[in-house]
Amino acid sequence: PVERNIYKKLDPSRCPSPSFVVDEDDLENNLKILDSVQKRTGAKILLAQKGFAMFYFYPLIRKYLKGVCASGLNEARLGYEEFGGEVHTYSPAFREEEFEEIARLSGHVVFNSFSQLEKFLPLLRKYNSSAEAGIRINPEHSETETALYDPCRPLSRLGVTAANFREE
């Protein structure tokens, strides 16, 4: 690792506490790495707003990333209004009273089950005919030993398993 003094540009005594401090140069260097991956692979890399929703930095981030991932209405709205670009929305269960706005804001909506897809796809087509729909796949592979944090644990309802997948 490169040793450097992060306080050259920052006087910690001037920051309110608690604070989130972001080194913009480091952020941009990381974004350049992600952009190089996109260019080499043809993949689109999206900002996961669940992990980083500091919209102050969205103008910088959108120079490099194609859009955002949203986990519901509020994140979809934030991505649409503040980031621009693509908005991909996923939720384990969409709420009927929110879905019209989610559909209007999102270019891609991923459903957790075939029943959710069947229920909401007509509304997605009604409110945003150009939006794409998908199904979350449960990979049935775990990297954690703690069941509580394992989306692939037995009887998990997060995504469709291979045994329950239907080709349509």
Segments the model singles out, each with a brief description of its role:
Residues A43-E168:
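Active-site-proximal beta-alpha core segment in soluble small-molecule metabolic enzymes
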Residues D11-C15, D35-Q38, A53-F57, A147-L148:
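A short alpha-helix capping/helix-coil boundary motif
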Residues L27-N30, L34, E168:
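Alpha-helical packing segments of well-folded alpha/beta enzyme cores
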Residues E3-Y7, L31-I33, K39-Q49:
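N-terminal glycine-rich anion-binding loops that anchor highly charged ligand groups
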Residues V2-F20:
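Generic N-terminal amphipathic, Lys/Arg-enriched alpha-helix
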Residues N5-I6, S13, R40, Y58, ...:
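Generic signal for short, ordered secondary-structure residues
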Residues V2-R4, E28-N30, Q116-L117, E140:
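Short amphipathic alpha-helical surface micro-motifs
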Residues C15-E24, A43-L47:
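A glycine-/small-polar-enriched, mobile loop at the entrance of the PLP active site in fold-type I
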